[in-house]
Amino acid sequence: MTKLGRFLGEHFKTVRLLNEDRVGVVAVTGRFVLLLACILSPKASAQTDHGTDYIRSSQPTLLIYTELVALSQQETVDPPLAAKLQTLLTTPFINNEAYFSGTKPLRPDVEGLGPSLRLVEWNIERGMELDDIKLAMTDKEGFLAKAHAEPNDKKKTMDKELIAQMDVFQSADVIVLNELDWGMKRTDYRAVVKELADALKMNWAYGIEFVEVDPKVLGLQSFANVKDEAERKELENLFSVEKNRVLGLHGTAILSRYPLRDVKLVPFKYQAYDWYNGEKKYGTVEAGKRKGASLLFGEEIVREVRRGGRTNLMATLDVPELPQGQVTIIATHLENRTTPKGRVQQATELLDMIRPIRNPLVIAGDMNTTGADGSVLNIKSAVVKKLNDPGWWATKGIKYATGVGLVMDLATFGFKTAKFQADPTASGVPLLAPNPEENFFDDLQKYRFDDGSRIDFRGDEKLSVNGRDGTLSNSNERAKKGFVTTFSLPRTLGEKGKFKLDWIFVKAYLTDDPKTVDSYRFAPAFARTMDDVNEALDEPLSDHAAISVDLPLSQQSH
């Protein structure tokens, strides 16, 4: 095999292809099962205390291969296909089979809190390591055995922490997940959300964020210009697909031991990046940025032509222990290909949408708080951006007059790395090192809902898993400096580039009145970052670490 083949083979993780039912068979079988359920059971749903039904199972109509090809090749498609795509991007998959099979919430009894709702959030990087993720979430002994059997095992001293983190996974009543594939070759055409939910015996909802239509994904990429015949055939084999198994779905999910109701899929009105036209037309400057990113971090960035955009998956849980008897879960994923200002706009849109909700709610997901401008640039916009940047003018004289520009660059990079990448909530230094994400967190902290409540930014030493206080430490684990980071990119030289990208924000009963009753009821506590589990095997489970929080169902005194 050529070097190119070995590189691509590892990058795309081409492994065995699991045999799964074809789309047509699934459709026919689904109709038969639905008909049988109606015959055997007069109701395929169950009544809730709120007078509504729990939907047993529903999903939108999926696209077939020829429709995916049309969506790839034609910017404007026929109205029926456009309508089908729109329905797919706004209609959630809902499955409460676990509830109908007897699954009930665990409500772990947490020391110092009592019975609690434990929530986990995790970007699982498409589900590339799905089998090991399932193992970590369901079989502690099996996962530890695999970790110790690996050639580079250095984990034996970490068993206690690994077990503690896996206990969190296995006792969670709600799991919010980003980046789940369904019908993609890179993940063996598997329905990642369904497999994981089945393994955990949990109800689930799935919202499509993108329909992947890049020519590479659909097996349409031509390699006729590759002169070496062996390499060309290898590429053609790597990018070939089984057309009857490709569904092209990529999205967000909520898994829950509580049954799910009032499930909604709401795309952002403000889409900061056009993943269809933008990926087809990136220009010279952007190509340079991509090369630079690869050089700095060793990150392989490839074109991703997609239909769809960033979205919000919302669901209501019936939690009778709380005054309103319900909790709203919002799973979100903010845009990475934009400026911090673009993410602020998306966050504001989300907050305004959920502002009327009076019961407790949790917002969880990959917020992409890199502090970086990941937007597509062209030469003109790059020049304009420089001219409008006061920080550039403040350092321009130093760079050109004294020759210490490199020192300034390194100092600025080090300051940002140590402070903002690990703690995007930190205050910046105007001109020298402003914090690009500062407005994001300021706006969240100042926001007030219609009932007078606010997002809980508290950091109590006694409610921290490691005894550290500070902004948001109750809901997101802090380190000695900043937060425990959740995302890493391997670099060619030195340590990994690490960032805090994934967040849990909780709105419960906290108001501006210090005498508010129940201000610690359902308030976040004992936040964890499960980075040890994520890194326990030679191949990380994801490029993101999972995070968790405990939410007490009764009032606590602190």
Task: Label every PLM stretch briefly.
Residues 238-239, 246-250, 257-345:
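Catalytic-adjacent loop/helix segments of enzymes that bind and process anionic phosphate/sulfate esters
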Residues 122, 178, 332, 364-367:
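Active-site flanking residues adjacent to catalytic metal/cofactor-binding acidic residues
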